[in-house]
């Protein structure tokens, strides 16, 4: 990594695992700023959801911001986390203080004004970068994450700001599209509603706005960065992304996982263990079997820890479940998501009582215990930008069985730390599962693979170094541009 000077960086995100999260975005938004802090002064801007306002962390109001078009006025508060991370909270009760998730109500219906809610977040980031927030701290670079923050680089560009920006794609399939009729209420200039701007098949796309107007685009694995330039994974944006890649404006930087994922120290586990302490790992397995009402067994235990959505390939797991059970295996499933996927999981468990168990919902403690207690993690994703679960599992000696795509391809060494299969078919998946049966029957090989998996270097240093280099390059270019005025 090249030498860098300490600069001010604002992360813009809709989730932060400390306070509110629905998936990997929240984990990354919490971990990466902390990993970067020894190099830069990194702070985070997030909406003031009830989970944030009521977190027990004091919030001190530092500024008021006016409205713009249909975007209402709001306040900015500062929250200092116990470890020193500074969080700026965008306080606007009419937009954010609602029961449910950051994106949907308690029944899972998307908020009808999400375009207003997250446009306000993007505008606040631009106002921050322009020095309009009354604070002694002003970012020199803005790093926006996924579609909810997509308008941050866009508003910065439309307002004529020279502050460089990065837009990170965590999942291209979630694009934040809205009717072009909303352009006036969002204050979007007509010249931005073009194929080169944020127009996408007759609609406005927040994720495309981020990609179009940011100084640089990243995504969360090298393989996914290549995949999204192809029709199979590009979600209709492959041509646009290929043009960015051709200009050197698209790169893949892998996520890491934090140091709490350590089987020897994790406070959530029933029993700590180190490599080769497999009888202690079995104590965690016994807990998982009891939690999911599975029969006592010495056969392989497979875990599913996932959002229950089509992307995750859960229909494939349903298709191979009987094969797993017939070979002496059991499956424990935890997650929440689309109602039809949740119902399918319940029906699967009902078909195989004592062999397959499901818990709809998500609990961090139980998820960690599942990684620690299982022998294998099932992850047949149709696509996976990065994925974190396969890294969590390996750290706890659970070998992932995953499709060879995106970040899964980059973080699993086939036959060494896990099992990869190529096609998104039951046949290809079954071939990989047959290999798990063979390995499980040969304990010396199983334990050797577990040891290699637990030693895999999934830390944030792998992401910090390339991001630090990218920050330096963008800030250097910005100085050169500014000096020409």
UniProtKB/Swiss-Prot annotation:
Amino acids binding ADP-alpha-D-glucose: 21
Pathway the protein contributes to: Glycan biosynthesis; glycogen biosynthesis
The EC number(s) this enzyme carries: 2.4.1.21
Alphabetically ordered keywords of this record: Glycogen biosynthesis, Glycosyltransferase, Transferase
One GO BP: glycogen biosynthetic process
Gene3D superfamilies (UniProt xref): Glycogen Phosphorylase B
GO molecular function: alpha-1,4-glucan glucosyltransferase (ADP-glucose donor) activity; alpha-1,4-glucan glucosyltransferase (UDP-glucose donor) activity
Role played: Synthesizes alpha-1,4-glucan chains using ADP-glucose.
Protein name in UniProt: Glycogen synthase
Taxonomic classification: Bacteria, Pseudomonadati, Pseudomonadota, Gammaproteobacteria, Pseudomonadales
């Amino acid at each position: 990594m090249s030498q860098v000077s300490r600069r001010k960086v604002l992360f813009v995100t809709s989730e932060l695992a400390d306070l509110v999260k629905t998936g990997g975005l929240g984990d990354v938004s919490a971990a990466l700023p902390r990993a970067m802090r020894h190099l830069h002064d990194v702070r985070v801007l997030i909406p003031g959801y009830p989970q944030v306002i009521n977190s027990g962390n004091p919030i001190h109001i530092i500024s008021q911001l006016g409205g713009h078009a249909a975007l209402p006025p709001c306040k900015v508060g500062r929250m200092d986390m116990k470890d020193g991370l500074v969080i700026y909270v965008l306080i606007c009760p009419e937009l954010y203080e609602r029961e449910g998730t950051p994106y949907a109500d308690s029944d899972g219906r998307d908020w009808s004004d999400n375009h207003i809610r997250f446009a306000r977040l993007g505008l606040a980031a631009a106002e921050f970068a322009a020095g309009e927030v009354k604070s002694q701290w002003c970012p020199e670079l803005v790093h926006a994450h996924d579609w909810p923050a997509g308008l941050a680089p866009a508003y910065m560009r439309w307002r004529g700001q020279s502050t460089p920006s990065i837009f990170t794609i965590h999942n291209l399939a979630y694009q934040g599209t809205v009717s072009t009729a909303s352009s006036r209420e969002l204050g979007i200039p007509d010249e931005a509603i073009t194929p080169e701007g944020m127009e996408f098949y007759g609609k406005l796309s927040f994720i495309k706005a981020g990609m179009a107007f940011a100084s640089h685009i990243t995504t969360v694995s090298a393989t996914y960065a290549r995949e999204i330039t192809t029709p199979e994974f590009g979600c209709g944006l492959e041509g646009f992304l290929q043009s960015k890649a051709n200009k050197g404006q698209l790169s893949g930087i892998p996520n890491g996982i934090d140091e709490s994922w350590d089987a020897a120290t994790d406070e959530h586990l029933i029993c700590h263990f180190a490599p080769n302490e497999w009888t202690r790992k079995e104590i965690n397995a016994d807990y998982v079997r009891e939690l999911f009402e599975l029969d006592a067994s010495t056969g392989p235990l497979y875990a599913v820890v996932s959002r229950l959505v089509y992307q995750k390939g859960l229909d494939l797991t349903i298709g191979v479940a009987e094969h797993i059970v017939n070979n002496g295996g059991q499956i424990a499933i935890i997650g929440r998501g689309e109602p039809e996927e949740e119902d399918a999981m319940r029906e699967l468990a009902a078909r195989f009582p004592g062999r397959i168990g499901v818990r709809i919902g998500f609990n961090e403690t139980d998820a960690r215990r599942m990684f620690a207690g299982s022998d294998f993690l099932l992850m047949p994703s149709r696509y996976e930008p990065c994925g974190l679960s396969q890294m969590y599992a390996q750290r706890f000696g659970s070998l992932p069985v995953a499709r060879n795509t995106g970040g899964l391809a980059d973080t699993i060494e086939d036959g060494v730390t896990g099992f990869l299969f190529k096609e998104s078919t039951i046949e290809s998946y079954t071939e990989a599962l047959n290999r798990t049966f063979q390995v499980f029957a040969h304990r010396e090989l199983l334990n050797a693979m577990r040891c290699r998996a637990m030693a895999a270097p999934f830390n944030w240093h792998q992401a910090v170094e390339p991001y630090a280099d990218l920050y330096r390059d963008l800030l250097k270019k910005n100085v050169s541009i500014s000096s020409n005025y």
